[in-house]
Amino acid sequence: MSFVLGIDTSNYTTSCALLDTADMRVRSCKKLLPVKQGERGLRQSDAVFHHTKQLPELMKQLFDKKYDISAVGYSYAPRCAEGSYMPCFLVGENVAQAVSLACGADLEKTSHQVGHILAALYSCGKLDML
């Protein structure tokens, strides 16, 4: 039985999930980035800081035991478009690369936007549409 780890570090939420490839069940952990009262968002440097603190905490919750990780997926940018870049995605990318190297797992990247589409397909049981 193997598992796929997914990591997303957007400008709003730190997220990680484990997909059990045997039964396609998902366990996930996520935490909103803290935005001060009256503000509308975060500077990228603040988002990077919060992801750096939150992602290890979430991974600790997710990994309640040792898992055979066969692949690691992560979001590298907001969209699959030339010039689409936000520093906050580097946190997830770096953790994904480290886990992939440590586990000898395949490494796959996608955009945050594609992640939303894949989550919708998974949620409605339509992964066969891929």
Walk through the language-model features, giving the residues of each.
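Short acidic/glycine-rich loops and adjacent helix/strand connectors
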Residues: M1-L130
